[in-house]
Amino acid sequence: MTEQYQHRARKRFGQNFLHDAGVIDKILRAIRARPEDRLLEIGPGQGALTEGLLDSGAQLDVVELDKDLIPILNGQFASKPNFNLHQGDALKFDFNTLGADPRSLRVVGNLPYNISTPLIFHLLQNASLIRDMHFMLQKEVVERMAAGPGGGDWGRLSIMVQYHCRVEHLFNVGPGAFNPPPKVDSAIVRLVPYETLPHPAKDHRVLERIVREAFNQRRKTLRNTLKLLLTSDEITASGVDGSLRPEQLDLAAFVRLADTLSEKVVTE
């Protein structure tokens, strides 16, 4: 990064710029971009990953919120024919405007940790467009995404991400790889949306509602946390033990509960 392109990281944007060349190379090797790929980078920052992605020959769209980074990114990459920059909030970005074919978009990002969870949920709403996603996230968030039932990490994020995607915790990254160093460890995760959902719900919005309601009071039993949505008999009819706590249920059980609620809403 030359002096011309220096930029101070902003706390309000959750900026921690990746600078470790070894980590950058490891991420690029995990992505393995090809010239025929359609890439979307969220939060390119100072372009640590951007250059390597462009060197693959793939078409690259980038979305950056910080207006002060726009001239820096344009100064470095605007001459590249496969570079297209969008200034705006990725949380509000309409991915359909990219004109990507179904299951063609490869999404990459060193995501600001303060918006990573809502951004993941926004991307899951567009899962039909996405081939895969590679993100740098807070290690704790990746562990929650990849968690299984029965532990404290299993929750709303785990269930909804695993409903849509196969999750791979690839490797961890220490604070020293960033400037300024964050106070937490980071990790790279790969998310691959399913072509065919292994546990399809009748209405994924109802599944989201059931999961949210259940984990709002995760230490209580299901018959207590879901009492405003389902009776104890309806929970039992779903093949679920109402005396269990939410963290003890797997994804398939939550889908059965959601389908019971969907049927109940239709018949009422």
Curated annotation (Swiss-Prot):
<dbReference type="GO" id="GO:0052908">
    <property type="term" value="F:16S rRNA (adenine(1518)-N(6)/adenine(1519)-N(6))-dimethyltransferase activity"/>
</dbReference>
<dbReference type="InterPro" id="IPR020596">
    <property type="entry name" value="rRNA_Ade_Mease_Trfase_CS"/>
</dbReference>
<feature type="binding site">
    <location>
        <position position="89"/>
    </location>
    <ligand>
        <name>S-adenosyl-L-methionine</name>
    </ligand>
</feature>
<dbReference type="GO" id="GO:0003723">
    <property type="term" value="F:RNA binding"/>
</dbReference>
<keyword id="KW-0963">Cytoplasm</keyword>
<keyword id="KW-0489">Methyltransferase</keyword>
<keyword id="KW-0698">rRNA processing</keyword>
<dbReference type="InterPro" id="IPR001737">
    <property type="entry name" value="KsgA/Erm"/>
</dbReference>
<feature type="binding site">
    <location>
        <position position="64"/>
    </location>
    <ligand>
        <name>S-adenosyl-L-methionine</name>
    </ligand>
</feature>
<dbReference type="InterPro" id="IPR029063">
    <property type="entry name" value="SAM-dependent_MTases_sf"/>
</dbReference>
<feature type="binding site">
    <location>
        <position position="110"/>
    </location>
    <ligand>
        <name>S-adenosyl-L-methionine</name>
    </ligand>
</feature>
<feature type="binding site">
    <location>
        <position position="18"/>
    </location>
    <ligand>
        <name>S-adenosyl-L-methionine</name>
    </ligand>
</feature>
<dbReference type="InterPro" id="IPR011530">
    <property type="entry name" value="rRNA_adenine_dimethylase"/>
</dbReference>
<dbReference type="GO" id="GO:0005829">
    <property type="term" value="C:cytosol"/>
</dbReference>
<comment type="similarity">
    <text>Belongs to the class I-like SAM-binding methyltransferase superfamily. rRNA adenine N(6)-methyltransferase family. RsmA subfamily.</text>
</comment>
<dbReference type="InterPro" id="IPR020598">
    <property type="entry name" value="rRNA_Ade_methylase_Trfase_N"/>
</dbReference>
<dbReference type="Pfam" id="PF00398">
    <property type="entry name" value="RrnaAD"/>
</dbReference>
<feature type="binding site">
    <location>
        <position position="16"/>
    </location>
    <ligand>
        <name>S-adenosyl-L-methionine</name>
    </ligand>
</feature>
<keyword id="KW-0808">Transferase</keyword>
<keyword id="KW-0949">S-adenosyl-L-methionine</keyword>
<comment type="function">
    <text>Specifically dimethylates two adjacent adenosines (A1518 and A1519) in the loop of a conserved hairpin near the 3'-end of 16S rRNA in the 30S particle. May play a critical role in biogenesis of 30S subunits.</text>
</comment>
<protein>
    <recommendedName>
        <fullName>Ribosomal RNA small subunit methyltransferase A</fullName>
        <ecNumber>2.1.1.182</ecNumber>
    </recommendedName>
</protein>
<feature type="binding site">
    <location>
        <position position="43"/>
    </location>
    <ligand>
        <name>S-adenosyl-L-methionine</name>
    </ligand>
</feature>
<keyword id="KW-0694">RNA-binding</keyword>
<dbReference type="InterPro" id="IPR023165">
    <property type="entry name" value="rRNA_Ade_diMease-like_C"/>
</dbReference>
